[in-house]
């Protein structure tokens, strides 16, 4: 097996592409309502992200019910129906092997809201205003640095 020579440690293009295919297929299955579970039928579920393992055998699906409430029963219902969902995802994709589906709560919306609130806090706004005024003022040291470099 060829060693991983990529730098940066991020996902490969194939991992990203397959993750996106799984995300679309899973969202399609959930949207059509073909799952007979009453918990899943009662919720509209979004699938913002799917992360693939390097060997493409495991798909970690980040899900969130619309409104963000009752996430625990939804995750349990998805896990209970993972076998059926995997079968349906496999029917919609042309892959050698269909990955195992694992479900996790998507916290990206909460993280985004937290960051937005943090950036809007008075202390951060004040600090950002201070740094922007420092960036616009001319720096007296740049001219002297150029003269010493030339010597």
UniProtKB/Swiss-Prot annotation:
GO terms for biological process: maturation of SSU-rRNA. GO terms for molecular function: ribosomal small subunit binding. It is found in: Cytoplasm. One of its GO terms (cellular component) is cytosol. Residues 120-151 are annotated as: Disordered. Keywords: Cytoplasm, Ribosome biogenesis. PROSITE patterns: RBFA (PS01319). Coiled coil: none annotated. It comes from the Bacteria. Pfam families: RBFA. Its main location: cytoplasm. HAMAP family: RbfA. NCBIfam families: PRK00521.2-5, rbfA. Monomer. Binds 30S ribosomal subunits, but not 50S ribosomal subunits or 70S ribosomes. One of several proteins that assist in the late maturation steps of the functional core of the 30S ribosomal subunit. Associates with free 30S ribosomal subunits (but not with 30S subunits that are part of 70S ribosomes or polysomes). Required for efficient processing of 16S rRNA. May interact with the 5'-terminal helix region of 16S rRNA. Belongs to the RbfA family. This is Ribosome-binding factor A. It comes from Xanthobacter autotrophicus (strain ATCC BAA-1158 / Py2). The lineage of its organism: Bacteria, Pseudomonadati, Pseudomonadota, Alphaproteobacteria, Hyphomicrobiales.
């Amino acid at each position: 097996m060829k060693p991983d020579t990529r730098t940066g440690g991020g996902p490969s293009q194939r991992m990203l592409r397959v993750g996106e295919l799984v995300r679309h297929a899973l969202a399609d299955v959930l949207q059509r309502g073909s799952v007979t579970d009453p918990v899943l039928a009662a919720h509209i579920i979004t699938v913002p992200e799917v992360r693939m393992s390097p060997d493409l055998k495991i798909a970690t699906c980040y899900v969130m019910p619309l409104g963000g409430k009752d996430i625990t029963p939804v995750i349990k219902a998805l896990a209970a129906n993972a076998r059926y969902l995997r079968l349906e995802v496999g029917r919609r994709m042309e892959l050698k092997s269909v990955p195992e589906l694992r479900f996790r709560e998507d916290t990206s919306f909460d993280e985004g809201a937290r960051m937005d609130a943090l950036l809007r806090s008075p202390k951060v706004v004040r600090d950002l205003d201070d740094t922007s005024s420092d960036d616009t003022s001319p720096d007296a040291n740049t001219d002297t640095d150029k003269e010493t470099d030339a010597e």
